[in-house]
């Protein structure tokens, strides 16, 4: 139901947050 922009943003954040958490 969320807009495409939100879905894309969420996916991008998840992809960036994953490596960051792995590094820490």
From Swiss-Prot:
Tissue range of expression? Highly expressed in the kidney, heart muscle and testis.
- Any Gene Ontology biological process: negative regulation of execution phase of apoptosis
What cellular component GO annotations does this protein have?
Answer: cytoplasm; extracellular region
In Pfam terms, one family for this protein is Humanin
- UniProt induction comment: Down-regulated 6 hours following staurosporine (STS) treatment and up-regulated 24 hours following STS treatment. Down-regulated 6 hours following beta-carotene treatment.
Q: Does the keyword Secreted apply?
A: yes
The GO molecular function terms of this record are:
receptor antagonist activity
Q: Where in the cell is it found?
A: Secreted; Cytoplasm
Q: Which UniProt keywords apply?
A: Cytoplasm, Secreted
User: Is NAD given among the entry's keywords?
Assistant: no
The family classification in the record reads: Belongs to the humanin family.
What role does it play? Answer: Plays a role as a neuroprotective and antiapoptotic factor.
Q: What is this protein called?
A: Humanin-like 1
Question: In which organism is this protein found?
Answer: Homo sapiens (Human)
